[in-house]
Amino acid sequence: MSSEMCPVCGLPSELCICEEVAKEQQRITVKVNRRRYGKEVTVVEGFDANEIDLHELSTYLKSKFACGGTVKGSAVELQGNHLSRMKAVLVKKGFSPEQIKD
């Protein structure tokens, strides 16, 4: 077997469920901030950067909302106000709806 083992759960990397378990345990906060010149930015924070690939999540959210964005610390910032659709997209991505606070 040439498969690598997950250092957290000990399962082969193809069967690793660490990221799915981590998604259900995150307490996520979604809010909209106003920046310079009245621009709105949707900030999604509360992720554990060690357990979830924030750059992959950022890329997914930017493509879903057709906007620009970035990762700052343990938060994902998206250009524009996406508060109304964010919870549904995060639930579809595998996050627990009870843990997402608007």
From Swiss-Prot:
Pfam family, one: SUI1
Organism field: Methanococcoides burtonii (strain DSM 6242 / NBRC 107633 / OCM 468 / ACE-M)
Similarity annotation: Belongs to the SUI1 family.
GO biological process, one term: translation reinitiation
Keyword Lyase: no
Magnesium listed as a keyword: no
Protein name: Protein translation factor SUI1 homolog
Residue runs in coiled coils: none
Residue ranges of the TM segments: none
GO function term, MF aspect, one: mRNA binding
Database matches in NCBIfam families: PRK00939.1 (NF002096), SUI1_rel (TIGR01158)
Keywords for this protein: Protein biosynthesis, Translation regulation
